[in-house]
């Protein structure tokens, strides 16, 4: 089932894509991409630091994200307005399904994320990073075991571990940022409340952050920002995509 993502930008300019120098409220750029042979939408999306649902919904003429037409030109939504808030630590925006890490007052790193599904909503609020772990074990919560009894009580590191290769633990009990063994779930509301990231995304963020760094989870579906004296607007409506 599709639920539509609508992104509106006015008066767009161009800047850097992944690690961005902060001069105004906008980062990245909008770009076009020509599909190559045997490429899937998740291949393209990961290469450009995007979630495939946002690319799919930005290109409504694509019928199947796994079977693409070579030579077809698609647009990539690699332009973002920064969420409102103090630019320090991590801001997780449920409104556009992205995490923003402010390395300092001049540089930001942005990552696509997946968040909690219905009845397992990712909470809003403020936290700090209380720990980091490479190749984490997953102690399965009782609430998940009740819903999915096939899980063992503890899942060892490896390809079957939903936490992936890295975990960043938050002061919100039971919530963390982690990798995944199902990267196609990034950009969706599919988790049990944790913040899911691409393997390469969590590895990069893991190396950047430290214990004690601040984290704020917000939900801003409508964002506005300035660049060069011009006001820009970005709107996300029904930003969920379910399979």
Residue spans of the language-model regions?
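Sec-dependent N-terminal signal peptides
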Residues: 4-12
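Sec/Tat signal peptide C-region and signal peptidase I cleavage site
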Residues: 15-19
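Extracellular LysM carbohydrate-binding repeats and other cell-envelope/extracellular binding modules
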Residues: 20-27, 52-89, 214-215
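Primarily a LysM-type cell-wall glycan-binding module
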Residues: 20-49
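Gly/Pro-biased beta-strand-loop elements
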Residues: 80-183, 207, 235-236
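Short beta-strand-centered segments at strand-helix junctions
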Residues: 191-206
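Low-complexity, Gly/Ser/Thr/Pro-rich intrinsically disordered linker/tail segments
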Residues: 220-243
């Amino acid at each position: 089932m599709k639920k539509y993502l609508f992104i509106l930008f006015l008066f767009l300019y161009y800047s850097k894509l992944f690690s961005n120098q902060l001069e105004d409220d906008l980062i990245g750029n909008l770009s076009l991409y020509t599909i190559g042979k045997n490429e899937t939408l998740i291949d393209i999306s990961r290469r450009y630091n995007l979630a495939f649902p946002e690319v799919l919904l930005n290109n409504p003429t694509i019928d199947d994200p796994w079977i693409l037409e070579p030579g077809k030109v698609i647009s990539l939504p690699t332009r973002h307005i920064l969420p409102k808030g103090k630019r320090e630590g991590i801001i997780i925006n449920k409104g556009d399904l992205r995490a923003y890490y402010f390395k300092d007052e001049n540089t930001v790193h942005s990552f696509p994320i997946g968040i909690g599904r219905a009845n397992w909503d990712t909470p809003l609020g403020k936290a700090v990073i209380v720990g980091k772990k490479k190749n984490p074990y997953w102690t399965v919560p009782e609430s998940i075991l009740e819903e999915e009894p096939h899980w063992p009580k503890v899942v060892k590191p490896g390809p079957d571990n939903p936490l992936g290769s890295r975990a960043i633990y938050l002061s919100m009990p039971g919530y963390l940022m982690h990798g995944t063994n199902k990267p196609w779930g990034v950009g969706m509301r599919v988790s049990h409340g944790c913040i899911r990231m691409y393997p390469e995304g969590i590895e990069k963020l893991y190396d950047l952050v430290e214990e004690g760094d601040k984290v704020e989870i917000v939900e801003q579906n409508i964002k506005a920002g300035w660049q060069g004296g011009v006001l820009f607007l970005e709107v996300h409506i029904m930003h969920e995509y379910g399979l």
